[in-house]
Amino acid sequence: MDQKKDPSNNLTERRVSKVQRPNKKKVRNQVESLSRNLERNKEGQLLQTVSKGHLKADSGHSLGREKENGELGIRSIFYDKDWNPRGTAPSHYRNIPYNPATFKRRTEVQARLGNLENIKIPK
């Protein structure tokens, strides 16, 4: 007998026969595992929606990254008359109003040389 005609030696014939005549026990096990996976996915989606709800509730109190970049002008902590006159926040950061009680601006920069004041600088 030819090897191509013999179904015991032909791999494609065996694969096709398994699909055409499936084993009931294997099919039942596959259906059960798929139903368990579906239940787990539903539980995971429920947890994700609860987490998203908590995230939305906490987003109003966040001092970190934010999508909107409002300009506060001179009231912003990011304001600088030379570098940032509009007071815009860096990308992905929230713009916070300046509070003089908690944040002190330096009006001028003073060099802190310590004991190095005696060194002569070449011209």
Swiss-Prot record:
Biased composition (Basic residues): 17-28
Signal peptide start and end residues: none
Major localization listed first in the record, in broad terms: cytoplasm
Annotated localization: Cytoplasm
Biased composition (Basic and acidic residues): 1-16
Region span, Disordered: 1-30
Record Pfam families: NpwBP
Keywords carried by this UniProt record: Cytoplasm
Protein family membership: Belongs to the AIM4 family.
Subunit structure: May interact with the nuclear pore complex.
Name of the featured protein: Altered inheritance of mitochondria protein 4
Recorded name of the encoding gene: AIM4
